[in-house]
Swiss-Prot record:
It comes from Rhodospirillum rubrum (strain ATCC 11170 / ATH 1.1.1 / DSM 467 / LMG 4362 / NCIMB 8255 / S1). It is found in: Cytoplasm. One of its GO terms (biological process) is L-histidine biosynthetic process. The active site is at residues 8, 129. Pathway: Amino-acid biosynthesis; L-histidine biosynthesis; L-histidine from 5-phospho-alpha-D-ribose 1-diphosphate: step 4/9. This is 1-(5-phosphoribosyl)-5-[(5-phosphoribosylamino)methylideneamino] imidazole-4-carboxamide isomerase.
Length: 241
């Protein structure tokens, strides 16, 4: 199972938010490229990057920081946040991003997701951020009337590489992931699912690893890695077993 260490970008810095609130950001590194290099040195196989400013603006904002990360590591990078059209998708994939994550646009314009999957097979993921089981969009500022499962099922035949499922109510709180909800989602899908939000301990990772058969491909971890609650080497070992 893959551990995706998270680099969330706000104003060019590596931060973590609490429950998606931009005014509750903690800066962990003012050099995202250095942070990515540290993750690579520790043995990570992927890097998960989110342009937080971009998610709210609806367009890429932290491009220089993303480009610095791509230059700093020889690892596959998946990128989300503010990617809302084919031009932005093409741009980032051409620049070396391995996989882009489409969130708001997946709800607003599902046909664009399908077109992107045709143009870039295996390189398009859908990010489903849920609050109380319902999809939230526009940088989590708006909660829709569509359930996470309903949205995921719309893309079952589209060729999506993965679903990134985030429980907003757990994100950045170190309260443990909503594993039951994510595993229940994964069991209904053929598309691999990545767990995100709330991971706080090695025991959380062991619980996720134990549910791999449900269709869980990996887990995204941020704050717990940065504040030392989870040792990165131990985390990689737990998920490799």
């Amino acid at each position: 199972m893959i551990l995706f260490p998270a680099i969330d970008l706000k104003d060019g810095q590596c931060v973590r938010l609490r429950k998606g609130e931009m005014d509750q950001a903690t800066v962990f590194n003012d050099s995202p490229a250095d942070q990515a290099a540290a993750f690579a040195l520790a043995g990570c196989r992927w890097i998960h990057v989110v342009d937080l400013n971009g998610a709210f603006a609806g367009r890429p904002v932290n491009a220089p920081a993303v480009e610095a990360i791509l230059a700093a590591v020889d690892l596959p990078v998946q990128l989300g946040g503010g990617i809302r059209d084919l031009a932005a998708i093409d741009l980032w994939l051409d620049k070396g991003v391995r996989r882009v994550i489409l969130g708001t646009v997946a709800l607003r314009d599902p046909q664009l997701v399908r077109e992107a999957c045709k143009r870039h097979p295996g390189r398009i993921a859908v990010g489903i951020d849920a609050r109380g089981g319902m999809v939230a969009v526009e940088g989590w500022a708006e909660t829709s009337a569509v359930s996470a499962l309903d949205l995921a099922l719309r893309f079952e035949d589209a060729g999506v590489a993965a679903i990134v499922h985030t429980d907003i109510d757990r994100d950045g709180l170190l309260a443990g992931p909503n594993l039951d909800a994510t595993a229940a989602l994964a069991e209904r899908l053929t598309t691999p699912v990545i767990v995100s939000g709330g991971v706080a301990s090695l025991d959380d990772l062991r619980a996720i690893r134990a549910r791999a058969a449900a269709g869980l491909e990996g887990v995204i971890s941020g704050r717990a890695l940065y504040d030392g609650r989870i040792d990165l080497a131990e985390a990689l070992a737990v998920l490799a077993d």
